[in-house]
Amino acid sequence: GLGDVYKRQKYGCINVHASLLPAYRGAAPIQWAVMNGDEVSGVTIMKMDEGLDTGDMLTKVEVPLAADETGGSLFDKLAAAGAKLLVETLPKLEKGEVTPEKQPEISTTEYARMIKKEDGKIDWTKSAVEIERQIRAMSPWPSAFTKVNGKNLKIWDAKVIAMFGGDLFSKIPGQNPTKSAGKVWVADETGLHVKTGDGILVIEELQLEGKKRMKTADFLRGYAIEPGTRLGE
């Protein structure tokens, strides 16, 4: 069995995992760290066993996340950090200078399941902060997406300009967050200002199906999106 293969090696089989284990065991630790708004990620060099990312930990290094970190940029950072750490760890392991540390049974975060294309679909009833993180986490794949006038629209860059700490639109007569979520409030050279379940999100870079990726201001010169248009339909 696989366990026998691991045991036959002098030092076992070594894995480079893109999280600070036991957090984010699983296939997509990078995207989930960005999605959850973590400020720090990292790499763990670990011994493999028959479980999924449950083997003994050998060494770790922390890597801070930038405020505009994407899934792609964090992948690059962790790949570089992991390669450096692996090269440092292997000689120490051979000399007996590394003490394997058992992982706790329970992880400090949810299992980092594999990302599917559907994870990029935006739910406008979520807060602007959550959606902005989703957009960054899903870049470059599968990309965050919605619909506008029945066409698929990828969203590449956005920023939160207002958070209300509650349901601002429910306090306006005839409005509530669920009904107004996804509605374009402003469409001009500053971007598409979209109402969310909590707050306003400004879409600054996008890509309509069949078109190239572009700044929203440039896009709006050739494609009209009227205020009141609801995204996601």
Segments and roles (model prediction):
Residues 112-114, 119-130:
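Active-site loop ensemble at the mouth of alpha/beta enzyme cores that anchors a bound cofactor
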Residues 23-27, 124, 212:
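Alpha-helix N-cap/helix-start motif
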Residues 64, 121, 209:
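Short, flexible active-site loop motifs that bind/organize anionic cofactors or intermediates
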Residues 4-118:
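Donor/substrate-binding cores of folate-linked one-carbon enzymes
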Residues 1:
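Glycine-rich phosphate-binding loop
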Residues 125-233:
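An anion-binding loop in the catalytic cleft
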